[in-house]
Amino acid sequence: MSETLRFDPIYSEHAIERCAWTVFFTQPLPEKLYGNVTQAAGDGAQERGFQPVAFRGIQFNAITGQVVSGQASGGPVEFVTPDGAQQLSITPQSVSFASTRYVRWTPFFGQVSDLPLKVAERFVDVVSVSALKVEYWDRFIWSGEWSDFDPNKLLRGDNQYAAPGAVRGGNAWHSHVGWFERTEGAVRRLVNINIDAVDFLRPNTIGPKPSIGVYTTIQDAFFLPGSLQVDVGIEAIKTRSTEIHNDLKSLLGQIILDDMQSRISLNSGARADVR
């Protein structure tokens, strides 16, 4: 019986629950320019079927003492598709795009280039890029129960990124590791890996199943206070984004077993086009 138990990716061709791309800037845009940028971004987003998300807050009039609800100027702006699967977020100091409808990197980054990157270009005309981040959330579902849960059927025995004490726990657990490293073309790189064993409820199923979620992210910093700054333009952001994506693929390959890598075609076949 135990030999039939296994992990399955959340989707038939890949395990990606969510992917996100974010570019950060060294300082916020001036308020008036930020308003112009978000207005243009909103028009473009709604042309593409996105809907604005209303942020409600409280504003205080120092003269009259009146407290009113509403959104303060210069605050975050967000647009989502009607099904909530895709999200464009803009703040005075960042632009982010996320999707739970990930198919493969090329169309995902095509969507980034279609609008979010154009918004970022308006920022780059005025302020410098401080960092670029790409994130992946992968999910694998256990076919059995917690009583027979075996993370060793997914995670490599020689992987350095899951705390041994957590993996031996047998029940729900969390492992987190992160480090800085040097990388060419940036001031420094931050790598983070979270591995969680938790209940997961699939749509149209009865009761949750044990699962392992693997969150991987790489953030390249191009500016740090007191250090040198690396000038980065839009074309460099495009190239760097794909480089980070490929490095994250390699990182996942160091975490999961070869059998699962083959099932999701991580580095060849369909997966090469998917991820």
Where does each model-flagged region fall?
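Long, compositionally biased interface segments
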Residues: 210-275
